[in-house]
Design a protein with these regions (language model features):
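Bacterial N-terminal signal peptides
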Residues: 9-18
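Short, well-ordered beta-strand segments enriched in hydrophobic/aromatic residues
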Residues: 112-119, 237-243
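Acidic/polar low-complexity flexible segments
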Residues: 25-55, 133-137, 141-198, 248-299
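Sequence/structural segment immediately N-terminal to covalent heme-attachment motifs in c-type
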Residues: 53-68
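Long, low-complexity, polar/charged, intrinsically disordered or flexibly structured peripheral segments
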Residues: 176-232
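The canonical Cys-X-X-Cys-His
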Residues: 64-74, 163
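Bacterial N-terminal signal peptides that target proteins for export
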Residues: 1-10
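Sec/Tat signal peptide C-region and signal peptidase I cleavage site
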Residues: 18-24
Length: 299
């Protein structure tokens, strides 16, 4: 009996070890980095983007070209930063740092999708930019929006489909109106899945958000985000999201699988700013063993 008990004990240990291996921490050293750039967009809304008199790129978009297909070159983004910083497009004043790089890496296994962002956060937002007014006053926030294929043009326009001229902090807009997707609905899968890490203040009070954007942005209700973790070393932030592949539209959680290409965008708030006073990426795609600007590696 003693031998059997020992055998079962060893067998149980082996089972536990196997389970640990199945959910082992991702090995990021084996994952290629894709550098993208995030920039301060000012009051540039989706309506502005689609107006030919203000944005000549509208023609390319109507023909099926993506924003990044036009604006990204070998040297980075080709955009008119002086125009974005001018009073017409940033009436409260632009940050000193208009653009900065973010490295993106991604892994997936049989259960989870992992996305890691690495960046150095500037702390030079305009003096009149809106900032956190309650403790903890989060010094940095990093968010990812994952687009549903049911959102028309999500692969082309990225998160700009949620940014409209009538949302809060836009000139003359309703101060209570949040980001939204036109004709958005959870049941039909017409929404953006939204996850965010918030740093807290002075190393305390970090938290995470698992929400979505339909007829408005909702910062709760999601169940797919396992955890969002962040650390800062020598001024460089590393933020890692662990999210289940499985989701449920009722919770605002999209479902992902190998062979899928996912539209996504990145937004970084620095210097305790809120609302539109952030740096955002163009729309990119994440490929899970599929074509994409960023390749998610299977581990």
């Amino acid at each position: 009996m003693k031998i059997k008990a020992t055998s079962f004990s060893v067998f149980g240990v082996l089972l536990g070890f196997g389970a640990q291996l199945a959910h082992a921490a991702p090995d990021w050293s084996q994952v290629p980095k894709r550098d993208i750039q995030v920039f301060h967009p000012g009051v540039v809304s989706h309506e502005w983007v689609m107006q030919k008199s203000s944005h000549s790129g509208r023609t390319g978009l109507t023909k099926g070209e993506s924003c990044v297909g036009c604006h990204e070159g070998k040297a980075g983004l080709d955009i008119d930063l002086k125009k974005l910083a001018a009073k017409e497009l940033e009436p409260v004043g632009a940050p000193k740092t208009m653009i900065f790089p973010v490295s993106v890496q991604s892994i997936f296994d049989d259960t989870n999708l992992y996305i890691r962002l690495t960046f150095k956060a500037p702390a030079d937002a305009a003096a009149d930019a809106s900032r956190e007014d309650a403790s903890p006053k989060h010094e940095v926030k990093a968010a990812i929006m994952l687009g549903s294929p049911q959102v028309e043009h999500s692969a082309q326009h990225g998160c700009w489909l949620t940014c409209h001229k009538d949302v809060r902090s836009m000139p003359g807009a309703d101060p209570k109106k949040k980001k939204y997707v036109e004709h958005g609905e959870l049941a039909g899968g017409v929404y953006y899945d939204y996850i965010q890490w918030k740093s807290g203040e002075a190393g305390k009070g970090a938290t995470q958000v698992d929400g979505h954007v339909t007829t408005e942005r909702v910062n709760k209700g999601g169940k797919a985000l396992v955890k969002a973790e962040g650390e800062v070393k020598d001024g460089v932030y590393t933020v890692t999201f662990t999210r289940k592949l499985a989701g449920n539209n009722a919770d605002g959680d999209l479902t992902f699988a190998a062979g899928q290409t996912i539209p996504f965008g990145v937004a970084i708030h620095t210097d305790k700013t809120v609302w539109r006073y952030h740096h955002v990426s163009m729309g990119y795609t994440l490929g899970l063993r599929a074509p994409g600007d960023v390749k998610a590696i299977k581990q």
